[in-house]
């Protein structure tokens, strides 16, 4: 039995039900699935599993604006309203949440990793609704556990921050997840392939830039780089990064976007990547056929305005799933 795991029991869709797929919405089509059901066998074809990670403990430890614990419900509500374009050959299963208000950050990350591995064993593509960016380490661990030690797993992070902070004295938080991944790779004598899109210089100290400069497998583009390059050159940079890689895990921190597009985040961003450009880049990553799982994190509903940020996060999920369904 999975720990800290709660299957979904409540629908987030409150509109009229229509059997016609031409007019269906996500909320009509998504089906509940209990990962603890021992009768389940691996699914055939391309299907997705949506799980919430109800934790912003890492944000609290990192002195951010708490509230991301409420994000999974907010994103589900927005996603349920979107039109369904995938016919009846692709399914998105809502498998519930990882939740544990009295559990430690490390315990919740471990619980998420086990749930992710269970999804992969069932041949379901994981979609995780954070939660703070501590979500990423649990998601990454689960993906790695589903692979053999020699299998590669590159990481692309759309984020204003490197999230490579040391954690030896403070313990892990929302800003340390990718340093934990890096350290795991070093311990296993693997190269940590990590590409950050949307870095803002005013959000990262010199220690982090120095760490990146000395690390062979880490690359980044600043938000200003992306603005100047345009999506086609950014996509070519991603292609070069993924050359020779078989798998990539994608994580989207909503603080990558300006406060005008994403006001409800744990750490607001005055600058930021254009969401329209981001959609094109995300679709390109999905079209590589290498994307094995993704998450959206750091949506903070108590700080949102008219669900702008939750809706944008749901929009990214919509377009990623559309492309992944065609290229997997």
From Swiss-Prot:
Keyword Secreted: no
UniProt: Mn(2+) 2 binding residues: 159, 161, 253, 255
Signal in keyword set: no
Role summary: Catalyzes the conversion of N-formimidoyl-L-glutamate to L-glutamate and formamide.
Cofactor note text: Binds 2 manganese ions per subunit.
Family of the protein in this entry: Belongs to the arginase family.
Its EC number(s): 3.5.3.8
A GO molecular function held by the record: formimidoylglutamase activity
Classification via PANTHER family: ARGINASE/AGMATINASE, FORMIMIDOYLGLUTAMASE
Swiss-Prot/TrEMBL cofactor(s): Mn(2+)
Binding site for Mn(2+) 1: 133, 159, 163, 253
Biological process annotations from GO: L-histidine catabolic process to glutamate and formamide; L-histidine catabolic process to glutamate and formate; putrescine biosynthetic process from arginine, via agmatine
Regions annotated as coiled coil: none
This protein's name: Formimidoylglutamase
Pathway, per record: Amino-acid degradation; L-histidine degradation into L-glutamate; L-glutamate from N-formimidoyl-L-glutamate (hydrolase route): step 1/1
Reaction(s) this enzyme catalyzes, per UniProt: N-formimidoyl-L-glutamate + H2O = formamide + L-glutamate
Record's keyword terms, sorted: Histidine metabolism, Hydrolase, Manganese, Metal-binding
């Amino acid at each position: 039995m999975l720990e800290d795991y709660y299957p979904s029991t409540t629908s987030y869709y409150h509109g009229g039900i229509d059997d016609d797929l031409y007019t269906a919405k996500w909320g009509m089509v998504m089906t509940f699935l209990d990962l603890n059901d021992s009768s389940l066998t691996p699914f055939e074809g391309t299907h997705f599993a949506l799980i919430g990670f109800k934790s912003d403990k890492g944000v609290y430890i990192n002195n951010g604006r708490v509230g991301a614990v409420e994000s999974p419900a907010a994103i589900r509500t927005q996603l349920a309203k979107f039109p369904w374009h995938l016919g009846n050959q692709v399914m998105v299963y809502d498998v519930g949440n990882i939740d544990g208000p009295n559990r430690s950050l490390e315990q919740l990350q471990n619980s998420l990793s086990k749930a992710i591995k269970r999804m992969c064993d069932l041949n379901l593509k994981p979609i995780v609704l954070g939660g703070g960016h501590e979500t990423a380490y649990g998601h990454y661990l689960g993906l790695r556990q589903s692979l053999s030690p020699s299998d590669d797993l590159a990481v692309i992070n759309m984020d204003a921050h490197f999230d490579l902070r040391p954690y030896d004295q403070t313990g892990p938080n929302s800003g340390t997840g990718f340093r934990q991944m890096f350290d795991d790779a070093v311990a296993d004598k693997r190269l940590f392939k990590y590409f950050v899109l949307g870095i803002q210089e005013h959000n990262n100290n010199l220690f982090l830039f120095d760490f990146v400069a000395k690390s062979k497998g880490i690359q980044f583009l600043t938000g200003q780089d992306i603005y100047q390059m345009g999506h086609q050159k950014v996509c070519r940079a991603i292609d070069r990064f993924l050359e020779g890689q078989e798998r990539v895990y994608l994580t989207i921190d909503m603080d990558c976007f300006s406060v005008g597009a994403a006001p409800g985040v744990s750490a607001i961003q005055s600058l930021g990547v254009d969401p329209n450009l981001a959609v094109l880049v995300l679709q390109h990553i999905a079209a590589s056929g290498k994307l094995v799982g993704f998450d959206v994190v750091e949506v903070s509903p108590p700080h949102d305005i008219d669900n702008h940020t939750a809706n944008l996060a749901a929009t990214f999920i919509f377009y990623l799933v559309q492309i992944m369904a065609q290229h997997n």
